[in-house]
Amino acid sequence: MSKHPMTVEGAEALKEELHRLKFVDRPRIVEAIATARAHGDLKENAEYHAAREQQSFNEGRIQELEAKLSHAQIIDISKLPNNGKVIFGSTVTICHVATGSELTYKIVGEDEADIKLNKISYSSPIARALIGKELDDAVTVETPGGMVEYEIIQVQYIVE
């Protein structure tokens, strides 16, 4: 399986979630199963079945996170030279040429993307158009509303 890029911050967030699932949620669920089992007949024990379902979800998420972390290529933006190029992990401010509105995005891995936090996946159309470009370059992005032209007005290598 190929490696997937991820920022240091993204990897840390996944590790924190994995730790919580293994050492907080897992013991709590095991205790809930034991408590429900003590109530007697398991066939009609809704608490038991709910706890087992929760356990199944928790274990599945643990496996998913372990797989993501094992296939992650963690990129530390602070160790890369700031040469003004847009790369994975950089924070880019762009200006919509037609309207003059400015947008700022951080280019991150697929699991880290969150448009509410202005984090976009490196595989998104905007990020694909920006990566490799430099300050003052113009890029054209295909959007559902048609082709949109942006100008890169700032490139930062910010570590959160």
Curated annotation (Swiss-Prot):
The keyword Transcription applies. GO terms for molecular function: DNA binding; RNA polymerase binding. Keywords: Coiled coil, DNA-binding, Transcription, Transcription regulation. GO terms for biological process: DNA-templated transcription elongation; regulation of DNA-templated transcription elongation. Residues 50-70 form a coiled coil. Necessary for efficient RNA polymerase transcription elongation past template-encoded arresting sites. The arresting sites in DNA have the property of trapping a certain fraction of elongating RNA polymerases that pass through, resulting in locked ternary complexes. Cleavage of the nascent transcript by cleavage factors such as GreA or GreB allows the resumption of elongation from the new 3'terminus. GreA releases sequences of 2 to 3 nucleotides. Belongs to the GreA/GreB family. This is Transcription elongation factor GreA. The lineage of its organism: Bacteria, Pseudomonadati, Pseudomonadota, Gammaproteobacteria, Legionellales. The gene is greA.
